[in-house]
Structures are given as C-alpha cells and as structure tokens.
Amino acid sequence: PYDPEGARALMEEAGMADFEHELISIDDDWRRSTTDAAAAQIRDAGIPVRRTILPGSTFWNDWAKFPFSSTNWNHRPLGIQTLQLAYRSGVDWNEFGYSNPEFDALLAEASSIADADARREVMGRIQAMILEDGVTIQPYWRPLFRHYVDGFVGLDMHIAYFPNLWFWGRAA
C-alpha cells in the first residue's frame, strides 16, 4: 500500500533518512516514465532521490550491477522460469543480488513438480517470500500487442513476445 509516512519512518529508524537513492533507467519512453513515477513516490515520502537516465548502449553494459534500476521481464512459458533466471542465488541475471537458501530450496522443489496444481502451492510460498523480503518492486505487467491489417494470417501475439515468423502469411 502507498504509505509515504511509513516509508519515511522506516528510513529514519534505519538511520538513513538523508541517504540519497539513485534510480537508474534506460532512456526509453515507458521504463523512463515508470522510474520517474517511482522517484516521485519516494520524494512524496521526503526521501532524497536522484534520477539517472542512460542510453541503452551504456545501460545494458551494467544493468545487473546498479543498486536501483528499472528493467523489464517478458513472460516465460512457465512462471518458474523467470524466477530461475532472475532470483536464484548466484545466477548471472540476478539483478537484485537476492540470495536466500530457503528460497532456492523452494525453487528447486517447485521445479521438480510436473503437476501445475501441485506446483501452485509451492509457487505461492515463493511469491510470498519475494514480497516479504522486499526483493523487487513490480508496479505492473506490461501488455504487449501486435497490430496488423486484414489479409494476413498467423500474426497472433505469442505470450513470450516471440514472433512465430513461420506462421506468418497472406490469407487465401
């Protein structure tokens, strides 16, 4: 929930009320705007924040090393795949630097369960842990669309934003 006073109180309790946070984003339209909105909410709490906007050629060289940056993750066929790529201890794309042996054990358990309904219970515990540990700020899931005109077939949007070029063609 949006609680600027509570956020400020937590920073004061930690002795970091005057610490200036740097929020880094790539110079594009939606990630820049999303990070600007996050910075505004931090400022609403009276917490100092500096925005740094980098060109893609600079941002992507160090994206996983910034202490606070905005990135995006597109959908994977299984929800657990993003967790394996981005949250498991020691993996290259773990931009959060998150390391929790209990999380890793639950992730291994969930990965071993073939039945989606059985896996759902473990995934719920994993997702609660990410929330409770404050690992990431996830403001929204970005909708992806593909626009095309009549007369073509096979242009449906793939859930992972993957273009299935071999299905594209002209309608008969």
Model segments located where?
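Short, well-ordered beta-strand elements
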Residues: 18-27, 49-52, 70
